[in-house]
Regions:
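Structural preference for solvent-exposed beta-strand-turn elements
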Residues: 1-383
Length: 383
């Protein structure tokens, strides 16, 4: 194996492929990154990683002078490529080692037994395409509410529901719930699919595939690729594909938790509310709520109690309906506010002890944007 490749293209592709490598692999070869030249007659360079859960494959242009394959430490190769000077990179296999030359810098890497490396799973059949920037933004909003407790694996995922030309992303950790909708171009107009995808992998993948205009989503309900979801995008003059195993289990039926009517609807400047919550929550003890009192044209935030430190701040708000006082975990509240992209946030309530629904709006008078909704459970207030 021998090839010559642009330094930036190689460094970017290696970093992308190595990002999902396990920190403590169950088998040593799973820490490796597979480097192949001209696989299946493609004429280029292919970098692959796989840990039996998530696979990554990057194809990139290169001047190949000898075909072959080698398995080297993925993290080490990523560190080396990141530090190389801005000159063409030459890599070749010399016996049991891989030689890497860039300018006057020379590295020799020990290879791992390539024959022990598992075969990567095939991509399921393409289901449709979505704008890459829109998809990355939507996923970033949805994963905010995903659980992080591996004892409840179902809640660490994002449920993707596909109906025709619409994709819904749902996530919950039992204390908050996110729902994001976006349009896409399905391969079949009657597409109706659902999948539970690990939130961390989905967020990382969506964010890493924004170089090209579109991302292809590949999801199979049966046959080849069943139990997998695949994503494909373009970057660095080549193609990047990733697959991940779907989570098992039944995602809770959460759509009905969004109420259809509200007794109080408040609108507040998002930036002002974020700053106020950050200030007031400085005195809130661990796991205690920040109180929010909505009345007429004012929102008053309070935190702290008794002989401990206390804080209070009032900001302007447009409040329609009954006055209401409730409280929320300040970090969960900030997570939702930060995820909303609009300048104004709408908070809608049925009663103080029930969840609030948050959404964005372009102005105090504009229609709420319900493409993204964030439902947040209240916390019991300290008397």
């Amino acid at each position: 194996m021998k090839f010559r490749v642009d330094r930036d293209v190689l460094a970017d592709a290696v970093a992308w492929a190595a990002r999902s490598l396990p920190v403590r692999p169950s088998v040593p070869v799973l820490a490796g990154l597979l480097v192949e030249t001209n696989p299946e007659g493609t004429g280029g360079l292919v970098l692959s990683t796989f840990d039996y859960e998530t696979s990554a494959k990057a194809t990139l242009p290169a001047e190949v002078s000898a075909e072959g394959r080698a398995l080297v430490s993925g993290r080490l190769l990523a560190d080396i490529c990141r530090s190389l000077p801005n000159k063409p990179v030459e890599m070749s296999v010399e016996g049991a080692k891989v030689s890497l030359i860039c300018g006057s810098a020379r590295f020799s890497l020990q290879t791992m037994p390539v024959e022990e490396y598992p075969a990567l799973p095939d991509m399921p059949a393409a289901t449709g395409t979505v704008n890459s920037e829109s998809f990355a933004a939507a996923v970033a909003q949805a994963v905010v509410a995903a659980g992080r407790d591996d004892m409840l694996p179902v809640l660490t995922g994002v449920r993707i529901e596909i109906e025709g030309d619409s994709i819904s992303l749902l996530a919950t950790d039992r204390f908050r719930l996110s729902h994001r909708e976006l349009s896409w171009q399905p391969g079949a107009t009657d597409a109706s699919l659902a999948a539970l995808v690990p939130a961390r992998v989905l967020a990382d993948t969506a964010k890493s595939l924004t170089a090209g205009a579109e991302v292809t989503i590949a999801l199979a309900t049966s046959g080849a690729g069943e139990g997998l979801i695949g994503f494909e995008g373009s970057a660095g003059g080549g193609v990047r594909r990733t697959t991940t195993r779907l989570l098992d289990g039944e995602f809770p039926k959460v759509r009905s938790l969004f109420p259809s009517q509200h007794v109080t609807v408040a609108r507040v400047d998002k930036a002002s509310l974020i700053e106020s919550v950050k200030r007031v929550s400085l005195v809130a003890e661990r796991n205690t709520a920040v109180q929010m009192a909505f009345a007429e044209d004012t929102l008053t935030l309070d935190a702290g109690s008794g002989d401990e430190a206390q804080a209070s701040e009032s900001i302007e708000a447009s409040v329609k309906g009954e006055a209401i006082t409730t409280g929320f975990n300040p970090q969960f509240l900030l997570d939702g506010l930060t995820a909303i992209e609009a300048e104004v946030v709408e908070m809608a309530f049925t009663q103080a002890s029930k969840p609030a629904v948050m959404a964005g709006a372009g102005s105090l008078d504009a229609e709420a944007d319900e493409d993204f909704r964030y439902l947040l459970m209240p916390r019991r207030l300290l008397s």
